[in-house]
Structures are given as structure tokens and as C-alpha cells.
């Protein structure tokens, strides 16, 4: 698979704090440790891990996964709000989705992992076209489950070495996976996101969404065309036929008036 995250099972206390290990052999945890060190217990752990590993290898080769069915944020509904850390201009910043309401359209796209293969081709393509999105009063936001430190390291790596170089928009860190989950793109057993893309209007409403599997990159041209069509149809008297681009003939959403369009094609 082009982008795969490995996982390690941790034994921890319910608290997020880390406590120093106790050296006393009378500690209640000793019996638990003895259980783990017994031949039958360790064999069970090994066999369980082997089964998970074999499934992971199969997924890597297939370049495709089956996501769990969550409640997806549907087109026409409000986009789930979030606030998260991000990297922009080689600095750590805060990004809150609702800050764009009433101001800008937002293209929010998810990608699986930093330092992978398909992902940088998409991320840099959106960056190279950022000025065109700015002219359409639109902000671009990229999201993955990586930390801001990973984002920063990737941005500081030049493109010829598989890095991103400087970007013209923020990369958001979703280490808690809460954003990916709320937008219905999280692959639960791998802890990474599918290639989801959402166009959100100035009222904070999702107007367009696409979700690609891991091995398939997205088209900036098609995203741009869709955004232009969405903004054009802000006029309630016009709709856009298939493949419509700015300057081409649109259609009236009326049984009689639409005949003018069909008679001209």
C-alpha cells in the first residue's frame, strides 16, 4: 500500500500521566508481569500479533481498504467544526474551521501520511495553484494524522528529496484522529485517513465531497472546476450541466427554459 501506518499496543494507566516504575517485588503488578512471562501467555500474544501482521501485509499489496461505515457528513449539512494545530510558513499556528464562516470557501482535504508517495504530488499541486483558489476567495487546508513536528520536517525537506518545500496553505495535525472521524474518512484499524475532499461554502455548509481510496490521487483541475461551478450556481436561476467550465453555456432549472440549452448542443 502506498500509505500504511503500523500500530503498537501499549499497556498504560487510564490517566494520561506517566508514573515511574516501582522496584518493589511486592507490587500488585508483579503477578500480571508473571502472567505475561508465562509460556502460554507469550505464545498467545505472539500468535495474535502474527495474524494482525499478515492482514496488514495483504492490505499493503492491495492498495485498497474497506472503511467502516460511520455517519458521514452529508452534502447540504453543516461541516463539523474543529480547532487544531497546523504548520504554515514553517511556524506552528492554530486553525479553526468556523473562523472562515462568512468570509471564505474552504477546500478541506485529507491524506493518509507524511513522507509517503502519492500524498506529496497532491499537496504540492494544490500549493502551486493556490493563487487561483485565492482569486475565488477560497482557502485550502490539508489534514493528516501526523504531528505538527512531522509536518514541519516534511515542509523543510525539498521536493527533489521527496519533501514538500514551502507550502502556500496550512497542514493541519489530527493526531487525535477526531477530525478524520468526524468527516467519516478514518480507517479505524490503520488509524489513517482516506483521501477525502470537501468543499465548504461561506455559510459553513458542505457543498461537495469526494473520497478516494489510498492509491488514487486527486485532480486539482476537477476540484477547481467544481468550485467554480458551485460559486456560479449561487445564482438560483442557473445550474451547470456535466463538465461545465466558466464561459460555457449554463442551464435554466425550468422544464421549458432548459430547452434553450438542449436545442443549442
Curated annotation (Swiss-Prot):
Molecular function GO labels: thioredoxin peroxidase activity
Keyword line: Antioxidant, Chloroplast, Disulfide bond, Oxidoreductase, Peroxidase, Plastid, Redox-active center, Transit peptide
Transit peptide, start-end: 1-65
Active-site positions on this chain: 119
Enzyme class: oxidoreductase
Assembly description: Homodimer; disulfide-linked, upon oxidation.
PANTHER family reported for this sequence: 2-CYS PEROXIREDOXIN BAS1, CHLOROPLASTIC, THIOREDOXIN PEROXIDASE
Family: Belongs to the peroxiredoxin family. AhpC/Prx1 subfamily.
Protein name: 2-Cys peroxiredoxin BAS1, chloroplastic
Native source organism of the sequence: Spinacia oleracea
Source lineage: Eukaryota, Viridiplantae, Streptophyta, Embryophyta, Tracheophyta
